[in-house]
Curated annotation (Swiss-Prot):
PROSITE patterns (alphabetical): GLYCOSYL_HYDROL_F2_1, GLYCOSYL_HYDROL_F2_2
Enzyme Commission code: 3.2.1.23
UniProt-recorded name of the protein: Beta-galactosidase
Entry annotation: catalytic residues: 465, 532
Region of interest called Disordered, as start-end residue ranges on this chain: 29-48
GO biological process: one example: lactose catabolic process
Organism: Lactobacillus delbrueckii subsp. bulgaricus
Length: 1007
């Protein structure tokens, strides 16, 4: 309730002035409370279906007015709504044909359209007039009833059967109203006027699609005459974390004599752990159960207990409620956070509630997929950015085991950060403005009241990117007093250190690893977390290892990658981003920052995260295993290990399951069983993998959680076999032999024909390539401008010389080129061709005269598009780059060429590192590319780099050829952020340095 409208006095008339008054943010709402579940009988509890809840989800009626001028008195019982349309609840209006979705990040949706300041709202304020008819379930007829909106964006006025019910604004926590006196048994008419904008919109400037509607469930809640209104359960550990203590605070609607209760604590098997019975004499019930024989809760071992509270009147059960709890202690001691006595490291990701088809009306299936995929990727923590999620998500995090930062629905980014990152908090809200205190504080209170019993929530966050001020200091003070069992967080104070005390954590966004290390090595007073880091936009997350290496510092307690899922909306079978809906202003593709794609398929970045976030650190060296157990509560004997031996990519040996017992935090070196391998047999890979010993809720027995390998490298070297026939003509050099013919143009300096078994494989002239289709990080770092001279340098290379030399077992064709970029010498390519049609290609880049970076160096080949399949031996199975090799392992992999194109917004993709050989083929045959004494980077795609860079969406690309890019090297992809940070120097290519590409091209004969 606001400080303007007295809570004890019911308001009977709606007032549109509330939309622009920051001191009115809820009217006639009941106090926020815990999200426990209540049932009318033991049978209902066991079935999980409550007759005390009536869903109003489904088809509603709607009138949508873009200009905010809806039908007058539409809430009246006798209003004719026959012309209203149908709409789904829960759902976002903009995805159902009412208005358009708009994506903006920092700027407000009205920026440039209207010059307004807080708490003003745009004159164009879309209004959705919702209507729902329903009959009241019989179980409700003799009970008090509340009406609950779990999520509504942004401001709602509510009427029932013509009576004004109330008003609510906080989009992401419930607005709940008592409606008993307005209800009828049949033909009830519920009306909701939902406005897209209100003063609350200044506090909801999150980086997401701006969409409105009743996007979470709407329900009726029946309340028996004995009813649990609110339940606070503080489940902690005592006796060196071996025993449990449960502090119970229950608020009971007490309207009957001779009332009593029974509280049970039951384990996951349903066995009784503890019990307490007693009379109910007041609305407050408080007691403590001590010395409970419980197992601790953690993400590794999410042991849950069910608390059941039975309410009786004269011995008859009127209501039973349940709440899952986990017993755990989360403490801040000497500037370090501990869970159950162990220093914790958050290996986390930020996560928006998002579904490519449903917007923010996400499903249980979405949540379970996210959580299971996180667990399988060694992610142990999630930040609910930047608002409280559906209650179900926290229950699932409790169950599966994820640590959670729960964050209040408060972001006012655009009120203080301006173009270019310039800070101007002149009209920042809430800041120091006490007019915004009530609304801001209510958002924290609503979140904490609802979510307080969830074991997974370790940290309360005041909000996101809203600068600082006295309001945040007051909010922080409330949080710490209301809940000393958790730690309180707010990153915004980094912009105004006057309010440093408004957070218990030193939390920063996108700080480079070296900057973080400076903090960690200078007597840190607080624990450090990177609350947003490793910006995963497009082809990104390079050098994540620089951050995970900081875990050696006790005060470094991990971070949360930005972010989990791309926010691409599906339309006509395509995933679209900002601007594609004619939404202006917009921040375009900046909504595509996910470790998983918008359709919930995994991106190649996720394998890298899994490898670096693993709690089992494996290293194979000299045939031995170095093992570090970074689990907090799990012995490494809970996993089994396999050793595997691969020769030239083929598995030749695998051990029986092995067990290595290390306590949490311990390290050890173990001898491994390996068979003898003859030196001449080829390249040998010694691999160790760690696997789950038993089924877990998120993965089956045998699932691989970590792996490492040692390579006894043995790269192939070209050895010519016989000399081809040479035809030295005026315009061309021809080389031919049994079933092959190669033609070199003396005018162009390139091979213009490559035929094996009569089939032409060269569809266009080869070209040098020094470029790649710019990644999102490249664009943000300014590489398009800085390195533009390399984009077409290869395309416009000028032939200087071509010559031919006949050798005993081969023929050499030598070419020299100049570039429109000053080089230290000639750019040369030598082709050594033998009598079997094998071509050893050596391309030498002499280095540029000018200092700077080189994106890549190699050759582009356009091959027949019919070569649709690949098979290779190298790092895989995912694309990889010099700063994102982790999570890929040497082996033989195969698939369809089109699958090499990762569905980012079109940019560099598909590179395979440390390639030994790569085959492209169809049913008729194909080509094989082989490394020649040096590592090879190679990609095979249906599109060229030029096509990719020119396209805004993958569906715009056309497949004319199969394009091969064979590279000696390519710079890393970076990922510290996507708006300025460069690729780390050790993963860049110095343009002044000479480079050489060596590979062999030969026919692939299919048996």
């Amino acid at each position: 309730m606001s400080n303007k409208l007295v809570k004890e006095k019911r308001v009977d008339q709606a007032d549109l002035a509330w939309l622009t008054d920051p001191e009115v943010y809820e009217v006639n709402t009941i106090p926020p409370h815990s999200d426990h579940e209540s049932f009318q009988s033991q049978e209902e509890l066991e079935e999980g279906k409550s007759s005390l809840v009536q869903s109003l989800d489904g088809d509603w009626l709607i009138d949508y007015a873009e200009n905010g001028q809806g039908p007058v008195n539409f809430y009246a019982e006798d209003f004719d709504d026959s012309n209203f349309k149908s709409v789904k609840v829960p759902g976002n209006l903009e995805l159902q044909g009412f208005g358009q979705p708009q994506y903006v990040n920092v700027q407000y949706p009205w920026d440039g359209s209207e010059e307004i300041f807080p708490p003003q709202i745009p004159s164009k304020n879309p209004l959705a007039s919702y209507v729902r008819y329903f009959d009241l379930d019989e179980a409700f007829w003799d009970k008090e009833v509340s009406l609950k909106f779990d999520g509504a964006a942004t401001a709602i006025y509510v009427w029932l059967n013509g009576h004004f019910v109330g008003y609510g604004e906080d989009s992401f926590t419930p607005s709940e109203f008592m409606v008993t006196k307005f209800l009828k048994k049949e033909n009830n008419r519920l009306a909701v006027a939902l406005y897209k904008y209100s003063s609350a919109s200044w506090l909801e400037d999150q980086d997401f699609w701006r969409m409105s509607g009743l996007f979470r469930s709407v329900t009726l809640q029946a309340k028996p005459r004995l009813h649990l209104e609110d339940l606070k359960l503080t489940a902690s550990l005592t006796d060196n974390y071996q025993k449990g203590k449960l502090e119970v605070e229950a608020n009971i609607a007490y309207r009957l004599p001779n009332a009593s209760f029974k509280l049970e604590v039951r384990d996951s098997e349903g066995d009784l752990v503890a019990e307490k019975l007693g009379p109910i004499r007041s609305e407050q019930l408080e007691f403590t159960l001590a010395d409970l024989p419980v197992a601790a809760w953690s993400a590794e071992k999410p042991n849950l207990y069910q608390v059941r509270l039975y309410l009786y009147q004269a011995g008859s059960l009127l209501e039973v409620s349940r709440q899952e709890v986990g017993f755990r202690n989360f403490e801040l001691k000497d500037g370090i956070m501990y869970l159950n006595g162990q220093r914790i490291v958050f290996k986390g990701a930020n996560r928006h509630e998002f579904d490519s088809k449903l917007g923010r009306a996400i499903t249980e299936e979405d949540m379970i997929w996210d959580i299971k995929t996180m667990k399988r990727s060694n992610i142990n923590a999630v930040r609910c950015s930047h608002y409280p999620n559906q209650s179900l998500f926290y229950r699932l995090c409790d169950k599966y085991g994820l640590y959670v930062i729960d964050e209040a629905n408060l972001e006012s980014h655009g009120t203080w950060e301006k173009v270019g990152g310039h800070e101007d908090p002149s009209f920042n809200v809430p800041g120091d403005d006490q007019h915004w205190l009530g609304a801001s504080l209510s958002r924290v209170k609503n979140m904490m009241a609802r979510d307080k019993n969830h074991a997974s929530i370790l940290i309360w966050s005041l909000g996101n990117e809203s600068y600082a001020g006295t309001v945040f200091a007051q909010m922080a003070d409330y949080v710490r007093k209301a809940d000393p069992t958790r730690v309180q967080h707010y990153e915004g104070v980094t912009h105004n250190r006057k309010f440093d005390d408004a957070t218990q954590i030193e939390s920063r966004m996108y700080a480079p690893a070296k900057v973080i290390e400076e903090y960690l090595t200078n007597k840190p007073a607080k624990p450090f977390i990177s609350v947003e880091y490793a910006h995963a936009m497009g082809n990104s997350v390079g050098d994540l290892a620089a951050y995970t290496a900081l875990e050696k510092y006790p005060h470094y307690q991990g971070g949360f990658i930005w972010d989990w899922i791309d926010q691409g909306l599906e339309k006509d079978g395509h995933l679209l981003y900002g601007g594609d809906f004619d939404d202006r202003p917009t921040d375009y593709e900046f909504c595509g920052n996910g470790l998983v794609f918008a359709d919930r398929t995994e991106s190649p970045k996720l394998a890298n995260v899994k490898a670096l976030y693993a709690n089992l650190k494996l290293e194979v060296k000299d045939g031995q295993l170095f093992l570090k157990n970074d689990n907090l509560f799990t012995n490494s004997s809970s996993y089994y290990f396999l050793t595997s031996l691969l020769v030239d990519g083929k598995l030749t040996y695998q051990s029986r399951p092995l067990t290595f017992g290390l306590e949490p935090g311990e390290s050890g070196t173990f001898a491994l069983p390996w068979p003898e391998v003859a030196d001449e047999k080829g390249e040998v890979v010694y691999r160790v993998t760690a696997h789950l010993k038993e089924d877990l809720p998120w993965a089956d027995e045998g699932f691989t959680v970590a792996e490492a390998e040692e390579v006894a490298q043995k790269l192939p070297e070209f050895k010519p076999e016989g000399r081809p026939d040479l035809v030295d003509s005026d315009y061309n050099l021809g080389l031919k032999g049994n079933n092959f013919q190669i033609l070199f143009s003396k005018v162009k300096g390139w091979p213009v024909s490559l035929k094996y078994a009569g089939r032409e494989y060269l569809k266009r002239l080869p070209e040098f390539t020094f470029w790649r289709a710019l990644t999102d990080n490249d664009r943000g770092a300014g590489y398009g401008y800085d390195l533009a001279r390399w984009e077409n340098a290869g395309k416009y290379a000028r032939l200087k010389d071509i010559s031919c030399e006949v050798k005993e077992d081969s023929v050499l064709v030598k070419t020299a080129f100049t570039l429109p970029v000053a080089l230290k010498g000639d750019l040369t390519v030598t082709y050594e061709v033998d009598g079997r049609g094998k071509i050893a290609v050596t391309a030498d880049f002499p280095g540029a005269e000018e200092a700077g970076l080189l994106p890549a160096f190699g050759l582009n080949l356009a091959l027949p598009k019919e070569l649709t399949d690949y098979r290779y031996y190298g790092l895989g199975p995912n694309e990889s780059y010099p700063d994102r090799l982790e999570g890929n392992y040497l082996g033989i992999y195969q698939g369809a060429v089109k699958k090499n194109f990762s569905p980012y917004r079109p940019q560099e993709t598909g590179n395979r590192s440390k390639v030994r050989w790569y085959q492209l083929f169809d049913e008729k045959g194909g080509l094989e590319f082989t490394a020649n004494g040096a590592d090879l980077n190679l990609s095979a795609l249906p599109y060229s780099a030029a096509q990719i860079e020119a396209a805004d969406h993958a569906f715009e690309l056309t497949n004319n050829y199969t394009w091969v890019r064979a590279l000696s090297a390519q710079m890393g992809v970076g990922g510290d952020d996507s708006w300025g940070q460069k690729v780390h120097p050790e993963f860049c290519l110095d343009a002044q340095k000479a480079r050489q590409l060596r590979l062999v091209i030969q026919p692939l004969l299919l048996k």
